[in-house]
């Protein structure tokens, strides 16, 4: 199931822009203090670092990801998720716009 709408959150209106605009996101804060981000990655191959563990939920498009220390690229599409350990890196390869929700912690 793909998340299509998020209700009852505070949205930071200033966008987070990374990699010369290849990734753009906005921060969400839930009433209980939970933080997430929602964004899009445009066609590119990028490397992201994590502080906290992350779950990347694909809500549109698709991507391939490669976790730090592995050789395999894994494809995910709308309605699928992948987990990234904290204090690590992952590569993401996108050939069409990849829309996501990033769940932290």
UniProtKB/Swiss-Prot annotation:
Gene from which this protein is expressed: ppnP
CDD domains given in the database record: cupin_PpnP-like
SUPFAM superfamilies, A to Z: RmlC-like cupins (SSF51182)
EC number of this enzyme: 2.4.2.1, 2.4.2.2
GO molecular function: guanosine phosphorylase activity; purine-nucleoside phosphorylase activity; thymidine phosphorylase activity; uridine phosphorylase activity
Protein name from the UniProt record: Pyrimidine/purine nucleoside phosphorylase
Gene Ontology cellular-component terms listed: cytosol
Assigned protein family: Belongs to the nucleoside phosphorylase PpnP family.
Top-level EC class as recorded in UniProt: transferase
Function according to Swiss-Prot or TrEMBL: Catalyzes the phosphorolysis of diverse nucleosides, yielding D-ribose 1-phosphate and the respective free bases. Can use uridine, adenosine, guanosine, cytidine, thymidine, inosine and xanthosine as substrates. Also catalyzes the reverse reactions.
Catalytic activity: a purine D-ribonucleoside + phosphate = a purine nucleobase + alpha-D-ribose 1-phosphate; adenosine + phosphate = alpha-D-ribose 1-phosphate + adenine; cytidine + phosphate = cytosine + alpha-D-ribose 1-phosphate; guanosine + phosphate = alpha-D-ribose 1-phosphate + guanine
Pfam families, alphabetized: Ppnp (PF06865)
Keywords assigned: Glycosyltransferase, Transferase
Disulfide bonds: none
């Amino acid at each position: 199931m793909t998340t299509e709408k998020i209700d009852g959150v505070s949205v930071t209106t200033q966008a987070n822009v990374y990699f010369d605009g290849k990734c753009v996101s906005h921060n969400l804060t839930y009433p209980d203090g939970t933080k997430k981000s929602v964004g899009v990655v445009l066609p590119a191959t990028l490397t992201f670092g994590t502080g906290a563990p992350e779950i990347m939920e694909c809500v549109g498009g698709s991507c391939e990801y490669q976790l730090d220390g592995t050789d395999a690229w894994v494809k995910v599409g709308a309605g699928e998720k992948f987990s990234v350990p904290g204090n690590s890196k992952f590569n993401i390869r996108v050939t069409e716009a990849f829309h996501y929700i990033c769940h932290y912690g």
